[in-house]
């Protein structure tokens, strides 16, 4: 475990303490201290020691789903850089793998596809680390990690012990879990049970089915599914590219609103002049509605507010807010997010909620 020296008012902080270098938005202020953990033991030790010093703690891995304020973080940031994957159980039909929290997510997905392990292929191209996936219950193109996670190894900051939390106890819901709702647990590694198959799971997402030229419910070779997802994501600026400011983002900034039936019918009435809102009914009577559609129909199109903006909506996808220059501040991003949220609320009566974790800033 390595440590960047603590910054003080008398000494200019080391460049490694500036958090913009650790986020895909390239935004964020200074941290008091940055510690790098290259193993689960390092991660536990870094969090425990900072806690013993009475410091605030921020655990940061890929930095792809976090917005850090301009004031930075007045405490210790523990960078998760643990790597590794091992098979812990196998049978004729399935394989269970344990993956360290710092393992880059898309490298894991590529590995599973190459080994003909089915279950993660539609989650290709998502930036960030494996340890972040249960926190958000990451999902895309008809798959989410809650379907394949069997358990999560954690450090419990309350008891000071390590433990395994079974999937049934993780509180998985749409883009959320107990790990997002509380900072009590630090994810050390994640177990996934995957099918031993050269074919994808049934294609559930209509856009992906069209890209593959198959019917919803069909299965395709894993590599074909992965390639199609990567193409779709790249077309929306959702695959990291250092040369493309449309990818300097946290991906989808707002979650798709989940409405009860009455709320959905009210939305349909208010949207009657612009068309039927794209929606997906849930099994519990709720309806999930496209946030991208709501944003666009509220007058916030791709590229808003224009090419002169230091932060704008992506030119490829209305759900992504992007950093367009080296001069932007987090407050610029937050101001744009507030404008969009207020506009959607005024137009449709629906409140959008941010998907990323907000640190030292708020909408």
From Swiss-Prot:
Reaction equation(s) it catalyzes: UDP-N-acetyl-alpha-D-muramate + NADP(+) = UDP-N-acetyl-3-O-(1-carboxyvinyl)-alpha-D-glucosamine + NADPH + H(+)
Active-site residues, Swiss-Prot/TrEMBL: 175, 252 (proton donor), 355
Pathway given in the UniProt record: Cell wall biogenesis; peptidoglycan biosynthesis
EC number annotated for this UniProt entry: 1.3.1.98
Keywords: Cell cycle, Cell division, Cell shape, Cell wall biogenesis/degradation, Cytoplasm, FAD, Flavoprotein, NADP, Oxidoreductase, Peptidoglycan synthesis
GO molecular function annotation: FAD binding; UDP-N-acetylmuramate dehydrogenase activity
GO CC annotation, single: cytosol
Gene Ontology biological-process entries: cell division; cell wall organization; peptidoglycan biosynthetic process; regulation of cell shape
Keyword Thylakoid: no
Family annotation (PROSITE patterns): FAD_PCMH
Protein localization: Cytoplasm
Cofactor requirements of the protein: FAD
Function according to Swiss-Prot or TrEMBL: Cell wall formation.
Name recorded for this polypeptide: UDP-N-acetylenolpyruvoylglucosamine reductase
